[in-house]
Amino acid sequence: MGAPDEVLNIAPDEGDKLRAKALAADAEELPAGYYTSPRVVCTFMSISLTLLSTYFAFEASAAAISFIIEDIGPSENVSLFSTVWTVSQSISILLMGRLTDRFGRRGFILGTNCVGIIGGIGCLYSFQRFNTMIGAQVLLGLAAGQPGACILFIGELMSNKTKFLGNVIVAFPNVIATGFGPYIGQSLGINGNWRWIFYIYIIITAVSTVLAFIFYHPPSFAQLHGKKISRRDELLKVDWIGAFFLTAGMTLFLLGVSWGGSPDPWDSPKILGLLISGIVSCVIFVLYECYAKIDRPIIPMEFFPGTFAGFGCMLLISGVMGSMNTALFIMYPQQVQHIFSSTLSSWQEVAWMSSTAGFGIWAGIVTLGSLFHIFRHIRWQLIFGSAWVTAFLGAMASVNRHKKSEAIAFSICTGFVIGWAEDVTMLLVQFISSDENLGVTFSVVSATRAICGSIFTAAFISLYTIKFPGQLQSKLVPAVPRRWGFPGVLLVAGFAYWRALTGQCPSYWLLFPGMTSNLIQVTNDAVADSYAAAYSYVYYFAMALGVIAIIASACTKDFDHYLTSHVPHQIYAAKDADVDLLDSDRSTENVSSAAVTVSEKE
């Protein structure tokens, strides 16, 4: 007897649609105890542990970077430490979409975990070579594609109306990374034990890998395509040319954006070369995807036209929320350091205050995510959430050295909705995607968030960098009493710029002739006020982006009718993972019902 596709005279693409229908289920029809079975529980544990280990390593190592440099030596490539991680994660997510839709998710999860462990080992053994650590960060960034896509891996296992509950379960332990990660990283750095950041990462990721290897058996290649199509045939259909142009364009452009302004000026040949070549590569990629008639495009262009109220709005909201997340997650700790460091008593107090935004983001995901499907009225939730974030970003613009309590409250309130709104867009886009294209649809929205975050990181940093010198001049000179004269102004100006560059105000400045504790206090206050004024422009900029999110939310289609019991994919026992459902005893029932659905869609 031939393969099911041959017996039923099914074309390969139509067979994929029929199998996608057969692989899906209604939550009420799943076997009793399915979600409490060891294979499902351990799958959730595996994905949750990888999420925790990845973002712990990222947050903790970023907090300990100064201690890492002090230990293994300085490098002109320090700015690449976080940049290559972000760029690599974006590329990993984009490529993950199409490849895992075609070849299955299991290999991607196991492969990225192994790549991450290798990257962690590379960080451990980067003795006296910071460039070795940069290379290891590339591997860690590629491995971070998996936790960046955990909303897909968990979402496809849950019904439409309970997807966010699955995300809440996985994200719950991540408070250790987002809330406590910077504090733990700085503490380990101060005690000379920064390598334990990567020991912890390797240990947790190894446990996650073992759990995934034993229990994680999502639809396999045979279940997705049958046994008529070989992996070699499918590999030949992959859009490798498009993948090359996309990877090259993204890498060049994001490196140019990240390096622009600091350490290199925007008009330098290096930055212009990176930006222009990156944009040209991305344009070539889009044209190639549109006109080359590829069987398996990396990003299908048909997603974009005529779907603004669905896919288009999700792209806009995801991009804006990613940018706002950047404004809060990256800029706020710097703001705390620049404005409040002279008034906070210890590094512990600085670290805890810098973590409030992370706690807010985690609390919002856990709290609002649990109520998402109960409140319904999704479009109004998006409108209210976008307006909430925009309003509190405006409140953040009012923060100065006299408003420490307000800064803590506003950062928590802003983060409370940002994390939830980011995740919502990546869940909602799964509602409007066919089950066989869940990965590629998700990857575009998720990568948009990361790309916009990188772009606006550079824009925000450039904005406050440009505004700060003028603000310092306008606030410092009037603050110096006339009786101190010109020498006092020069001394204060020198200290102010040194304080602005280093963020430190050690007592040995009192040894300079004419310098007094009053002069130091005046300088600290002027620098803090100048930074507060400069950062306010960043939040005004972010508010303008928030208006875009509000408009996109108002234009979003009604998603409430998608809150059904439909479950796209399941976790199987290992012995059932390679069974073609169209070749099973129930194939006739599956094929007949699936064929009706496919014909109705067409």
Curated annotation (Swiss-Prot):
Positions annotated as glycosylated: 160, 590
Subcellular location: Cell membrane
SUPFAM superfamilies (UniProt xref): MFS general substrate transporter
GO molecular function: transmembrane transporter activity
Alphabetic keyword roster: Cell membrane, Glycoprotein, Membrane, Transmembrane, Transmembrane helix, Transport
Cysteine pairs bridged by disulfides in the record: none
GO cellular component, one term: plasma membrane
Topological type in the membrane: Multi-pass membrane protein
Principal location class: membrane
InterPro entries listed in its UniProt record: MFS_Str1/Tri12-like, MFS_trans_sf
Transmembrane domains' residue ranges: 49-69, 77-97, 107-127, 134-154, 164-184, 196-216, 240-260, 271-291, 297-317, 355-375, 380-400, 408-428, 450-470, 484-504, 532-552
Record family assignment: Belongs to the major facilitator superfamily.
PANTHER family noted in UniProt: MAJOR FACILITATOR SUPERFAMILY, MAJOR FACILITATOR SUPERFAMILY (MFS) PROFILE DOMAIN-CONTAINING PROTEIN-RELATED
Role summary: Efflux pump that provides the dual role of trichothecene export and self-protection by allowing the fungus to evade the harmful effect of its own trichothecene production.
Protein name: Trichothecene efflux pump TRI12
Annotated organism of origin: Trichoderma arundinaceum
Lineage: Eukaryota, Fungi, Dikarya, Ascomycota, Pezizomycotina
Gene from which the chain derives: TRI12
